[in-house]
């Protein structure tokens, strides 16, 4: 029995051994395949890691190159800005501006003075040495200006110097020269009373009847009453050659912005007129407006009433007359107005239509005291039309026609009391 069991066990073991060998053989093959797959996976991971590292290095190189380019660009840009910024020896920022201006005029009728600009108050009366068929040209209105600014812990200090060549015999002439600190201005600039802001645009550098281009040495204070209203007070040297200046002219101007399109300016002036033997108070009021009808259409108007002064508003008669003893015996009063409309047709073209009128009071005492009634005017008027063309931004070309007349208080020997101004003006400007 035992022998049978041993034989049976032996036979079972003998039969199972080949099967175990076959199973072991299969397991080894699978392990080898797994090892090969793991090895391939490791190789693939290594290649992927190398690729990622290479990409990262390339990205760093690109970013580094980009940063270098950006730094170079910023450095170059900064260099240009620094090169363009001008400073004075004292450290003030400096801005240069101005224009080169060529004026020409063909005068069919007009004044006898050699200058080509407005002479309406002195044009010869008809038939009396009229200056007709004259061509005139000049570059004297060429302008050069410097703006200065110094920053301080309190507030900025600014200044301006501007000159042209409209002095005697084309001599250099100061237009503006002033210091501005806070609300205060000291120096020479536009009069606080006779401002040019409300005159219609002209080519003529001296403007037309009803306007004023007066610049005076002055001390000015600007007080802001609100966001839309400010009051400007000034003491001015009116440079009136007919008067012995003892006290400055006092002027006041109230500006009010009604809305984005309408601006109004009310002005007043009082000054003393003095001779060696007498004194008289002169005064005046003014009212100006600027109205933007549309974004491309603008109306300007300015009105003055003045008594006893001829130094602020252009083209007026002498403010006062004296006798042989230097006593003031009469004063002149006048009213003047100018109005015009400017239309911007497109970015290159714009044009203006304007009209100006001045009328003196019929003061018989003044008229009878005139030494020459043909040289004082009962009234003056001028009308003009112009067009400006700007082919490119720095260049401006203009053409203008103006006609006007003056009527004297007394007739010339031939009986004429009227003189005419009849001109065509042209201008070419390069602004910088």
Can you describe what each PLM-predicted range is?
Residues 156-167, 230-239, 263-274, 354-358, ...:
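Transmembrane beta-strand segments that form the barrel wall of outer-membrane beta-barrel proteins
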Residues 389-395, 401, 418-432:
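Outer-membrane beta-barrel "beta-signal"
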Residues 1-25:
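Gram-negative bacterial Sec-dependent N-terminal signal peptides
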Residues 83-238, 251, 255-260, 290-293, ...:
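Outer membrane beta-barrel
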Residues 227-228, 252, 257-381:
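Detector for outer-membrane/organellar transmembrane beta-barrel domains
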Residues 22-108:
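N-terminal periplasmic/intermembrane-space "pro-region" immediately following the signal or transit peptide
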Residues 110-115, 166-176, 197-203, 238-249, ...:
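Outer-membrane beta-barrel translocator domains and adjoining extracellular loop/strand segments
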Residues 92, 133-142, 171-175, 213-217, ...:
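Residues that define the transmembrane beta-barrel architecture of outer-membrane proteins
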């Amino acid at each position: 029995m035992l022998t049978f069991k041993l034989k049976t066990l032996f036979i079972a073991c003998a039969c199972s051994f080949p099967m175990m060998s076959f199973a072991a053989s299969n397991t080894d093959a699978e392990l080898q395949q797994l090892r090969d797959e793991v090895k391939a996976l490791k190789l693939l991971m290594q290649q992927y890691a190398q690729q990622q590292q290479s990409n990262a290095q390339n990205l760093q190189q690109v970013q580094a190159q980009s940063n270098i380019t950006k730094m170079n660009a910023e450095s170059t840009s900064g260099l240009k800005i620094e090169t363009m910024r001008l400073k004075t020896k004292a450290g003030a920022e400096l801005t240069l501006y101005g224009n080169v201006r060529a004026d020409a005029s063909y005068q069919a009728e007009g004044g006898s003075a050699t200058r080509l600009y407005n002479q309406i108050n002195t044009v010869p009366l008809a038939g009396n040495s009229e200056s007709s068929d004259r061509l005139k040209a000049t570059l004297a209105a060429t302008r050069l200006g410097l703006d200065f600014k110094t920053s301080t812990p309190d507030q900025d200090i600014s200044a301006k110097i501007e000159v042209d060549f409209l002095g005697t015999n084309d001599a250099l002439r100061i237009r503006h020269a002033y210091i501005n600190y806070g609300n205060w201005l000291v120096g020479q600039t536009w009069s606080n009373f006779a401002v040019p802001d409300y005159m219609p645009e002209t080519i003529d550098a001296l403007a037309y009847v009803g306007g004023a281009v007066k610049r005076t040495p002055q001390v000015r204070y600007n007080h802001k009453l609100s966001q839309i209203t400010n009051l400007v007070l000034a003491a001015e040297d009116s440079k009136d050659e007919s008067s012995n200046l003892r006290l400055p002219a006092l002027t006041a101007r109230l500006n009010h912005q009604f809305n984005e399109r309408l601006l109004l300016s009310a002005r007043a002036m009082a000054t003393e007129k003095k001779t060696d033997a007498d004194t008289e108070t002169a005064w005046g009021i003014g009212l100006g407006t600027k109205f933007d009808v549309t974004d491309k259409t603008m109306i300007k108007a300015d009105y003055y009433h003045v008594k006893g002064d001829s130094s602020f508003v252009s083209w007026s008669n002498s403010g006062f007359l004296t006798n042989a003893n230097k006593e003031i015996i009469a004063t002149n009063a006048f009213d003047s107005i100018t109005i015009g409309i400017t239309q911007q047709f497109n970015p290159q073209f714009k044009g203006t239509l304007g009209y100006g009128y001045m009328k003196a009071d019929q003061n018989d005492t003044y008229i009878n005291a005139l030494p020459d009634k043909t040289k004082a005017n009962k009234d003056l008027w001028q009308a003009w039309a112009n067009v400006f063309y700007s082919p490119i931004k720095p260049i401006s070309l203009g053409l203008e026609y103006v006609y006007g007349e003056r009527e004297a208080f007394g007739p010339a020997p031939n009986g004429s009391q009227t003189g005419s101004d009849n001109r065509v003006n042209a201008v070419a400007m390069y602004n910088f």
